[in-house]
């Protein structure tokens, strides 16, 4: 833009006197000057902005380094706190395991001492038995050695007798065999001499007869051979004289025929090769034409298929992007709720761990060794508890277990995303089989390491809870029994004091023990006291059986609760 400046005096006169061309030149110069000034201003602004940008980049780089350092410090402190908490949890677990192992070692030491005592007793009894067996074996060996010596003596005598008889028989048989061999050798030599003489005489006779026949046949064959040679020579000369010209002609024609046949064979081979090559190329051209036509058709079909697949894939990708965006929105909305739920569960878990650590101080030695109590193992065979206490404890445990299971299931469902809840709408699907989805990761059995079903996750917790509930029920029953027994004892003591003291209350009491009417009042009171004592003894025995069935093991665990039986024998004089 052209900036307006102050008007110069006399400029109007100059402008009035200037021509159109000068005016045009002046306006162009003013426009160029304005453009140059504007360009300089823009360049200065650009340089200032670039310097400001570089300065901001340096500041941002330095601030980023500071922020990263500060963030590293914060993360390091958070990580240190997290590691401290983990170390504290690990140390608590380690202490718990150490206590449990110490208790196990003490129990094993006691078992080892008992086993060593049993072993020493068994060794002593075994050595006594072995000594008795050795004595018996030595006696048996001496008897067997004597029997063996007697048998050996008898066998040696029998052997010598049989050996003498066998040697004598062998000598006699050997002498007889020598005589028989000498007689047979003499007879064989005489027969061999006679046969050899007969063989030589027959051999000489046959040799003379064969030589005479050979000479006669040789003379006859020589005459026949000479006559045949003469006749063959005459026939051969006559044949050669008659067939010499035809033989020469035949040889010449044979050579010409061989040359012509060779030439014809070469031409035929060449012609066959050309025909085969022509047929091969025709077949190859037709085959290539069909092949390339099929390839072109296949390429066109593949092009159409790829085009349709591309369109379908593009539409599916668009739909997938839209679905993923929607799922991302749902995930971002559900993540905050899940994080809040997890924080609440983490607080509950920390509270549970704190309570467990506090409760661990009050655990007995048996509970440290066997932390998860099994009611089937705790109740010994042949003992029965109080039926009312057992029924009440089972009813309370059955009422509490479903509620706790439902709460745990609801908590697990709340921590799951909506997709997972849609896939597993009910607890029946989650526990139907191994292929069904589950609310949480697998739980493992601490003893065998096998997978635990989802419905059995809180089994160990309910074991300890039921044990504590049964202990509490037994203690309440024992407390009520002791209160009733205390009241009965107070009543008996009051009656006894009333019977031995004289005061206004006793005299004003309608049932006065000092008053005897026909000697029946004291008898009635005595029978009543005996019946009350029998009822108290029966209740005490029932409460004792219930306590033993609940606590189990009796004196085996050093920290088990001991039930106290109080027996009071009141005698009214």
Curated annotation (Swiss-Prot):
Organism of this sequence: Chlamydomonas reinhardtii
Annotated Basic and acidic residues bias: 13-22
Keyword annotations: Cell projection, Cilium, Coiled coil, Cytoplasm, Cytoskeleton, Flagellum, Methylation
Disordered: region residues: 1-22, 416-450
Disruption phenotype: Defects in DRC2 give the ida6 and sup-pf5 phenotypes characterized by reduced swimming speed, disruption of the assembly of several other N-DRC subunits and destabilization of the assembly of several closely associated structures such as the inner dynein arms and the radial spokes.
Keyword Metal-binding belongs to the record: no
PANTHER family: DYNEIN REGULATORY COMPLEX SUBUNIT 2 (PTHR21625:SF0), NYD-SP28 PROTEIN (PTHR21625)
Modification type Asymmetric dimethylarginine: residues: 96, 142
Subcellular location: Cytoplasm, Cytoskeleton, Flagellum basal body; Cell projection, Cilium, Flagellum; Cytoplasm, Cytoskeleton, Flagellum axoneme
Oligomer status and interactors: Component of the nexin-dynein regulatory complex (N-DRC). Interacts with DRC4 and DRC5.
Reported function: Component of the nexin-dynein regulatory complex (N-DRC), a key regulator of ciliary/flagellar motility which maintains the alignment and integrity of the distal axoneme and regulates microtubule sliding in motile axonemes. Plays a critical role in the assembly of N-DRC and also stabilizes the assembly of multiple inner dynein arms and radial spokes. Coassembles with DRC1 to form a central scaffold needed for assembly of the N-DRC and its attachment to the outer doublet microtubules.
UniProt family annotation: Belongs to the DRC2 family.
Entry GO CC: axonemal dynein complex; axoneme; motile cilium
Compositional bias ranges of the Basic residues kind: 1-12
Record-linked Pfam families: NYD-SP28, NYD-SP28_assoc
Protein name per UniProt: Dynein regulatory complex subunit 2
Predominant place of localization: cytoplasm
